[in-house]
């Protein structure tokens, strides 16, 4: 798998190993590979896992493969019913991720999207978007992506966070934020190849900075950015060693995971009845 770029010109961006991912050893190995490839490893809880086991699995006394805080892993529960019987939710998530990438873009979340081909779930879960204590939302609070099935909704993927949540509060705990960062970092690194070994001068620096700014300015996946030399370095010393330190900042678009409303009943609009007379 690590030879994908050498052979095909591209690395895998989603790693899924159905059934084998039920052990912590395999899940850990998936996350290691995902870290090398700048990918996301999708791992599912074993078949037969109960809700309580899934939640406990995130803690030190857990007995399943969910004891991780990796920013390269995403955890899924429960198994779903499909054409082949019980099927891994992680497998369906991988397919949905690719479908979403192609049809909307890599910065769109797979959460709250219909799971095609899914006709049931191994474990029934209460699901209400406006109830923080519903079982689907309780799973999300523990960094577990699940299935939302409420009245008239069908079966939908539900959850945005990577396994590093809730330990890590940085926005990179959103899967889409991590993937946006991966695309940007990889694109800039590959672009910079054409500048390697050219003379360090104003023309090189201006071209580098200008081109990166132009690239970031075309992205629909971010809401803002900045690019400059990295002044945390001693630039004269860096240039003398053949190094050109750059620093770019960006803010990815994040999913609207919760929409809150403040409902206020007031008498003040009764004045409209008077003003209209």
What is each model feature region?
Residues 1-108, 112:
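Extracellular Cys-Trp
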Residues 35, 150, 220-222, 239-241:
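A generic structural signal for short, non-catalytic loop/turn and secondary-structure boundary residues
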Residues 87-211, 247-277:
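Long, contiguous, structured domain-core segments that constitute the functional module of a protein
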Residues 223-242:
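Long, charged, glycine-rich C-terminal linkers/tails
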């Amino acid at each position: 798998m690590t030879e994908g770029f050498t052979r095909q010109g591209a690395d895998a961006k989603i790693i899924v190993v159905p059934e084998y991912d039920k052990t912590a050893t395999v899940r850990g190995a998936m996350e290691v590979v995902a870290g090398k490839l700048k990918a996301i490893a999708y791992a599912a809880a074993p078949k037969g896992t109960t809700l309580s086991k899934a939640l406990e699995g995130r803690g030190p006394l857990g007995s399943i493969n969910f004891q991780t805080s990796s920013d390269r892993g995403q955890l899924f529960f429960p198994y779903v019913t499909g054409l082949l019987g019980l099927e891994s939710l992680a497998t369906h998530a991988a397919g949905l991720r690719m479908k979403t990438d192609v049809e909307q873009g890599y910065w769109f979340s797979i959460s709250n999207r219909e799971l095609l081909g899914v006709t049931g779930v191994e474990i029934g879960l209460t699901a209400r978007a406006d109830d923080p204590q519903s079982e689907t939302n309780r799973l999300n609070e523990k960094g577990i992506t699940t299935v939302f099935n409420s009245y008239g909704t069908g079966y939908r993927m539900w959850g945005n966070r990577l396994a590093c949540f809730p330990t890590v509060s940085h926005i990179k705990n959103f899967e889409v934020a991590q993937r946006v960062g991966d695309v940007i970092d990889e694109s800039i690194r590959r672009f910079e190849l054409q500048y390697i070994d050219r003379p360090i001068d104003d023309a090189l620096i201006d071209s580098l900075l200008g081109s990166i700014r132009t690239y970031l300015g075309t992205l629909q996946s971010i809401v803002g950015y900045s690019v400059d030399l990295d002044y945390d370095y001693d630039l004269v010393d860096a240039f003398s060693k053949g190094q050109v330190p750059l620093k770019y900042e960006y803010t990815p678009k994040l999913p609207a995971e919760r929409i809150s409303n403040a409902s206020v009943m007031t008498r003040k609009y009764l004045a409209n009845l008077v003003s209209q007379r």
